[in-house]
């Protein structure tokens, strides 16, 4: 939906002053539109990326105008595929639930090849997503659960959700499985990292139903990074490095998935014989699925 009426309303707030300023600088028969103005930052970003130097297009907007444009992108993702939506924000929950099942099993998980033989999953799993799927996964992760609905008329400069901090060229969300000694004060951490192809949000008290971890006792935690910056789960971040105990996070995601209802109904599946169970991330452990294919380098 590209943010729908929220984006339209914000465009009507921030673009007209920019349009008037730029139009006053133009001599001749050229009339700019709001759409023209909204595309200029894209020219700035993409040309800078392609050429490796700052594009002259970047000089057209002031710093504040770029921040207003940044907020436009926040609205586009938040109300297009993120927490401001109904179904789109849930689309990556089955995947994340299946990924947490792999985390719970540990770093020695085995899978099945196409010929039926077994293999050990690597300690680093990498998946490549587009920007919309990345935002859906971020929404499912829970790191922005305390974000209030974004206003379509006022830019909140203290908002936790700033899409430009993670929806970048090669933007990433990483889920780290940490095995630590003690109750969170140890620096002895062994990490297994699961990455998907960012300052931390404020913390609240940790809601931790699992038994307290005793000193000198091993425990397993989950920590989330957006473009390498740690983003704590607002309701569970008392572990080492603002992490959450893995059992608690697994239950948090499982409960979220259960509350999202039937995926047959969510996706309006009407095809006879269609699968009734969402597997989420079976492609990590089962390479024999008929819909998988190999891509030669």
Please name every model-derived segment.
Residues 1-125, 129-297:
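Signature for phosphate-centric chemistry
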């Amino acid at each position: 939906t590209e943010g729908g009426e929220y984006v339209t309303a914000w465009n009507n707030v921030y673009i007209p002053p920019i349009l008037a300023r730029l139009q006053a600088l133009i001599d001749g028969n050229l009339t700019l539109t709001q759409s023209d103005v909204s595309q200029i930052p894209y020219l700035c970003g993409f040309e800078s990326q392609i050429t490796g130097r700052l594009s002259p297009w970047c000089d057209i907007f002031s710093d504040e105008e770029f921040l207003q444009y940044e907020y436009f992108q926040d609205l586009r993702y938040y109300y297009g595929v993120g927490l401001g939506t109904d179904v789109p924000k849930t689309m990556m929950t089955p995947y994340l639930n299946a990924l947490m099942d792999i985390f719970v099993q540990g770093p020695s998980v085995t899978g099945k090849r196409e010929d039926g033989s077994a293999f050990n999953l690597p300690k680093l799993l990498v998946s490549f997503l587009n920007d919309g799927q990345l935002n859906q996964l971020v929404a499912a992760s829970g790191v922005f659960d305390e974000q209030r609905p974004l206003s379509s008329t006022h830019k909140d400069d203290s908002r936790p959700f700033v899409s430009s901090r993670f929806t970048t060229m090669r933007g990433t969300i990483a889920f780290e499985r940490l095995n630590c000694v003690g109750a969170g004060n140890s620096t002895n951490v062994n990490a297994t990292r699961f990455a998907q192809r960012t300052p931390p949000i404020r913390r609240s008290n940790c809601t931790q139903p699992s038994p307290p971890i005793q000193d000198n006792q091993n425990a397993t935690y989950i920590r989330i990074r957006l473009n390498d910056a740690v983003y704590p789960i607002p309701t569970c971040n008392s572990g080492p490095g603002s992490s959450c105990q893995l059992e608690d996070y697994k239950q948090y995601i499982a409960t979220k998935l259960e509350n999202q209802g039937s995926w047959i109904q969510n996706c309006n599946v009407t095809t006879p014989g269609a699968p009734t169970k969402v597997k989420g991330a079976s492609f990590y452990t089962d390479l024999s699925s008929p819909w998988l294919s190999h891509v030669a380098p």
